[in-house]
């Protein structure tokens, strides 16, 4: 069901639209958690470190696709708010072929550079065998990731956040069942975990594509387009590429830090692999809320509903900050039990390192919550370049401080953990300051 976010209660509209997105991303995290949990319990610390490092790499690679889809989705929302059906159809067509081409290119590059990644990420010898086996399979799922994210972005842009949730729920269940069968039953090792994830990704991608083709008139009407204007492709690419750059820079910084983490050995690698899953799971709802907020702002920006934009911003800040405060308290208190979900209780060194990470990051979730709102705001107001600037500041600070602080013997790996919230807070300060200085021009 499509939801017109330019009408009705501001807070209620955002929350009802955001809840399926949050639930959907919870299920998306189940892909990764299923791999990590089963691998950690049944295949050992080296396999856990391999899958954890692979997850960071895959996040970087798929961020290219995700960024392009998010950028296109923002334009779709603006067209929907403007009631420009023909323009929406042209944007869908132009973005689909552009992102499909980028996906094919990304897949080729990933396979060609597979062995080079070992040097860049400083992967230890005892981990590389499992990591290579996992990556060589998981790369096959990149086209499935494209299909799901493209059509999910389109459906959400017109206010339908429920259908992406349904397809993701089905694929999440399939992923977990296949994980158990391939790893425990068939003894296929880390390759089996990758195979389970790839099958689930194609199931969700093909399923949602078929649904959109059958049920959405905007997608079906693409067949009536006589030609595709190059200026439309240029507009899509100029906007989506900036969003893509923002996502890629963000995850490149994370990938660079992963290489630094790997240099501290298998114990820290395994701790980081488990803790980063918990960390992402904890703040993921505010990330999804930021994306839902972005769609709300974009539709109202297209409809020139300035009052709803400002009301929505105030409401979103209150909701996001309240949630972050609660989650920060829970993660701080339950950090150790959360680590034992992924790591055997006897692995005390791994658990201690993970608890340290979680308590430092978790204390500053309000910082990342604010940053996600800023990303969504500037994307919706057709200022994706500002999102790139904020990302460069956040990740640049994180990477620079991580290397500087961790090189001090008295600080060590703790310096990597502290670099993250410092980067969040600096980016927040700039993003909020820019909006306050330019709000009359941004939302006239």
Spans of model-derived segments:
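Small-residue hotspots at the loop-to-helix junctions and early N-terminal turns
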Residues: 45-56, 135, 194, 266-281, ...
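Transmembrane alpha-helix boundary and packing residues in multipass membrane permease domains
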Residues: 21, 25, 37, 74, ...
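Transmembrane helical elements of multi-pass membrane transporters/channels
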Residues: 16-35, 137, 148, 171, ...
């Amino acid at each position: 069901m499509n939801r017109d976010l330019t009408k009705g209660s501001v807070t209620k509209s955002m929350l009802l639209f955001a809840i399926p997105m949050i639930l959907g991303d919870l299920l998306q995290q189940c892909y990764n958690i299923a791999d990590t949990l089963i691998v950690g319990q049944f295949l050992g610390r080296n396999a856990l470190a391999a899958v954890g490092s692979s997850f960071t790499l895959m996040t970087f690679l798929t961020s290219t696709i995700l960024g392009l889809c998010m950028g296109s989705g923002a334009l779709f929302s603006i067209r929907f708010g403007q009631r420009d059906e023909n323009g929406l159809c042209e944007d869908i067509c132009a973005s689909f072929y552009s992102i499909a081409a980028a996906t094919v290119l990304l897949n080729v590059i990933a396979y060609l550079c597979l062995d080079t990644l070992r040097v860049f990420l400083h992967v230890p010898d005892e981990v590389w065998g499992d990591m290579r086996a996992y990556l060589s399979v998981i790369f096959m799922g990149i086209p499935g990731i494209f299909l799901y994210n493209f059509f999910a972005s389109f459906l959400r842009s017109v206010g339908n956040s429920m259908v992406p949730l349904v397809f993701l729920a089905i694929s999440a269940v399939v992923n977990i069942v296949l994980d158990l069968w391939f790893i425990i039953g068939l003894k296929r090792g880390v390759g089996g975990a990758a195979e389970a994830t790839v099958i689930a990704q194609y199931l969700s991608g093909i399923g949602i594509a078929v649904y959109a083709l059958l049920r959405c008139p905007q997608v079906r009407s693409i067949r009536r387009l006589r030609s595709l204007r190059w200026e439309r492709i240029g507009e899509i690419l100029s906007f989506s590429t900036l969003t893509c750059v923002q996502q890629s820079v963000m995850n490149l910084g994370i990938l660079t830090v992963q290489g630094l983490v790997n240099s501290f050995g298998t114990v820290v690698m395994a701790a980081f692999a488990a803790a980063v899953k918990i960390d992402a799971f904890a703040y993921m709802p505010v990330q999804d809320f930021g994306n839902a907020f972005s769609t709300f702002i974009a539709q109202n920006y297209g409809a020139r509903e300035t009052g709803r934009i400002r009301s929505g911003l105030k409401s979103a800040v209150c909701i996001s900050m309240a949630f972050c405060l609660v989650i920060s308290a829970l993660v701080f208190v339950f950090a150790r039990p959360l680590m034992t979900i992924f790591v055997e209780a006897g692995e005390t060194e791994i658990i201690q390192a993970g608890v340290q990470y979680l308590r430092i990051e978790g204390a500053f979730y309000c910082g990342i919550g604010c940053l996600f709102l800023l990303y969504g705001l500037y994307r919706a107001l057709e200022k994706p370049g500002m999102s790139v600037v904020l990302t460069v500041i956040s990740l640049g600070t994180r990477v620079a401080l991580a290397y500087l602080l961790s090189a001090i013997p008295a600080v060590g790996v703790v310096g990597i953990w502290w670099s993250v919230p410092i980067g969040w807070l600096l980016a927040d300060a700039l993003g909020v300051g820019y909006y306050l200085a330019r709000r009359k021009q941004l939302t006239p």
